[in-house]
Amino acid sequence: MKLQLCAVGRLRSGPERDLVEDYLGRFERTGRPLGLPAVQLLEVEDRKGGGMEAEADLLARAMAPGAVLAILDERGRTLSSPEFAEQLARWRDAGRDVALAIGGADGLAPRLRDRADLALSFGRMVWPHMLVRVMLAEQLYRAATILAGSPYHRV
């Protein structure tokens, strides 16, 4: 299983980057004994100004061939943290590669949204794509702690 976080734009040094690195490090330490691989953070940039379509091409090229595509989109499904953990465990148990895709400031191109196996939402509000990375990294860590039976996730 490969687990990729594919995102448009590069995080500069600062609090968002620090948080993403912290949560992905925690995920790796917690997830490894559970058979979950370290997350590969793949950042793409459209330097030619081609917009969402060009970003979709770059994201598609970054993803592992045949990977389950899970996108972050405000029109997607809202899962609880335990439901997300269960989904992650199903992908792991099936040996599936997973690409979690976050679009740029304008979102994801319709053709990428249409081919997604799962569209996830952090609610009906629109979030800055840099914060979505932080939130997704935290939810990955939270999912690993749920699967490990750790007290981090309290209800």
UniProtKB/Swiss-Prot annotation:
It catalyses: pseudouridine(1915) in 23S rRNA + S-adenosyl-L-methionine = N(3)-methylpseudouridine(1915) in 23S rRNA + S-adenosyl-L-homocysteine + H(+). S-adenosyl-L-methionine binds at residues 71, 103, 122-127. Its EC number is 2.1.1.177. Specifically methylates the pseudouridine at position 1915 (m3Psi1915) in 23S rRNA. InterPro entries: Alpha/beta_knot_MTases, RlmH-like, tRNA_m1G_MTases_N. GO terms for cellular component: cytoplasm. It is found in: Cytoplasm. Keywords: Cytoplasm, Methyltransferase, rRNA processing, S-adenosyl-L-methionine, Transferase. Belongs to the RNA methyltransferase RlmH family. This is Ribosomal RNA large subunit methyltransferase H. The gene is rlmH.
